[in-house]
Amino acid sequence: MSSNYVIHPIPLETIGGFAKPKMTYPFNWGQTVSMGVYVWYLEGPRENIIVDVGIAPERLLTRGYTVEPIQTLDEGLKKMGLGVGDIDFVIVTHSHHDHIASAHQFPKAKFIIQRAELEFVRDPHPIFKAIHPKDLLELIEGLHFEVVEGDTKIDEGIELLLTPGHTPGNQSVAVKTAQGTAIITGWCCIQEDFDPPPEIREAGLFLIPPGIHTDLMQAYESAVRVKNIADLVIPIHELELIHKATIP
């Protein structure tokens, strides 16, 4: 039986007017960018696995974002022939609200999270409390967590890579596909971060780190690691991926 996977982006909504330096630090001041919010279904030979669970647009609207809904979580999963009760595992890339706020909809699933990330979300630094609203902790405390530490192989086709910097326990998801290793970054980024314009490369940067970070140098090194390993990098908020049904 093949251990190759097919990755299905499930776009939930787009966010407009997002300050671009949050994605492309320290460049593009005064510019904004639109981004996608996704769940990722990893179609493979055995269990039903998704990466992240997204956030309902209503929660984003209360925080002042410009939001364009695409589909609900239920609608997106239904297109995959699934319901929330069919999901066996949720891989949590990191604990920011747009990646984990809908976790309570999956009562049967095991949530795979890095130990450093679980500790971070339970006791965030005051700087990050805006991204970890008080009720977020209440939403996730009843979840069934499977805690990992460091790089962890889930099966022959999926490996978790500890890629800290955006958050202390950010993890990227390396997926074996028919066209090589695809890596879902985990941290908040867009395609431009991995294909910076010539003037940025001339400044000596191989890529652009995220503007939201707990450790900037660590975030940069994690991004370099992913780019060097991956045959295909999947920037987790790249807007163009809303048009992709499958990867590769």
Which residues fall in each region the model found?
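Short, structured coil segments at secondary-structure junctions
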Residues: 3, 106-107, 229
